[in-house]
């Protein structure tokens, strides 16, 4: 039996007309950087209430930019979950920092906020929760811990 990891075809079919129209506009304009990308960035910034948004080609690039914006340096520590795509730890290590893994809550598969504080050291700069399977990590608890210890989430 073959079980697909994710059914991209079903997701595509749901928005096919909208996606195809946007792709056609980009191809017709021959503007592949800027144009629609700039429009997307403006819409994302407005939607999120941020001053700026930067579109990235991958989540890996987005993580790298976020860590660089936080001025993560060699020797810094970032708390995250071990139950994530490799890019989370990879980009931490790429900058010479250390991923510090906090175990998951076995009910949600997300990082267990009750275990975070025990892993915080003087070198800890941030907490990177990862929400999985349609369940958001306990952001209220994580943000409270981060605020208490002056960490970025």
Segments (PLM) and residue ranges:
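N-terminal "arm"/small-domain region of PLP-dependent enzymes with the aminotransferase-like
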Residues: 1-29
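Short beta-strand segments
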Residues: 4-7, 57, 128
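PLP-dependent aminotransferase-like
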Residues: 68-153
């Amino acid at each position: 039996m073959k079980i697909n990891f994710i059914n991209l075809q079903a997701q595509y079919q749901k928005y096919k007309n909208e996606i195809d129209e946007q792709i056609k506009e980009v191809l017709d304009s021959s503007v592949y950087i800027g144009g629609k990308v700039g429009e997307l960035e403006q819409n994302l910034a407005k939607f999120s209430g941020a001053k700026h948004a930067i579109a990235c080609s991958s989540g890996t690039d987005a993580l790298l930019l976020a860590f660089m914006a936080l001025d993560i340096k060699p020797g810094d520590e970032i708390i995250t979950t071990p139950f994530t795509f490799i890019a989370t730890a990879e980009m931490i290590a790429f900058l010479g920092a250390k991923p510090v893994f906090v175990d998951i809550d076995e009910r949600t598969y997300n990082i267990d906020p009750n275990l975070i504080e025990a892993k915080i050291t003087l070198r800890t700069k941030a907490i990177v929760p990862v929400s999985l399977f349609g369940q958001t990590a306990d952001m209220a608890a994580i943000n409270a811990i981060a605020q208490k210890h002056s960490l970025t989430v």
